[in-house]
Curated annotation (Swiss-Prot):
It is found in: Cytoplasm. The lineage of its organism: Bacteria, Pseudomonadati, Pseudomonadota, Gammaproteobacteria, Enterobacterales. This is Translation initiation factor IF-3. It comes from Blochmanniella floridana. IF-3 binds to the 30S ribosomal subunit and shifts the equilibrium between 70S ribosomes and their 50S and 30S subunits in favor of the free subunits, thus enhancing the availability of 30S subunits on which protein synthesis initiation begins. Its main location: cytoplasm.
């Protein structure tokens, strides 16, 4: 049973004429397949089909195992360099008391210092929905209290369902 490969190599290539690139990366030109496979075998390397859709297909003489190793290594390096953005959510209500507000504010400051984005959700219950301006004031107060630590990415213009949502991101620290 043959395993799936990204590229056809050596005798798997069925085209008679190919555009050949040498092991050093220089263009050799359009050659017969048998001549190309002979050159690869003389160098004890593989003939790898790089671009099968071009006319004629492009093949390169290389060490296929080393090529796959380098490719896997570079994709792992790229994954390491990617930064995953975590979002922490803090919930408020229009009538959140001062003590609770301060505790939640401390948590937001801690999360911002740790580099997290913050999703602040302001939930309305019952008749509170009539007083949307109170909710907007709470969100403005939060942004005023934290203006030196964060930037507001999304500020709500209206109530969505029974809640308003604001997204905060930590300010970039000077290097």
């Amino acid at each position: 049973m043959q395993s799936f490969r990204l590229h056809r190599i050596n005798r798997e290539i069925t085209i008679k004429k190919i555009r050949l690139t040498g092991a050093d990366g220089k263009q050799i030109g359009v050659v017969n397949f048998n001549e190309a496979i002979k050159q690869a075998e003389d160098l004890e390397l593989d003939l790898v089909e790089i671009s099968p859709n071009s006319d004629p297909p492009v093949c390169k003489i290389m060490n296929y195992g080393k090529f796959l190793y380098e490719k896997n290594k570079s994709t792992k390096e790229q994954k390491k360099k990617q930064k995953i953005i975590h979002i922490k959510e803090i919930k408020f209500r229009p009538g959140t008391d001062e003590g609770d507000y301060q505790v939640k504010l401390r948590n937001i400051i801690k999360f911002l210092n740790d580099g997290y984005k913050i999703k602040i959700t302001l939930r309305f219950r019952g008749g509170e929905l009539i007083h949307q301006q109170i909710g907007v004031r709470v969100l403005h107060r939060i942004s005023q209290d934290l203006h030196d630590l964060m930037t507001v990415e999304i500020f709500p213009n209206k109530v969505e369902g029974r809640q308003m949502t604001m997204i905060l991101a930590p300010k970039k620290k000077p290097v």
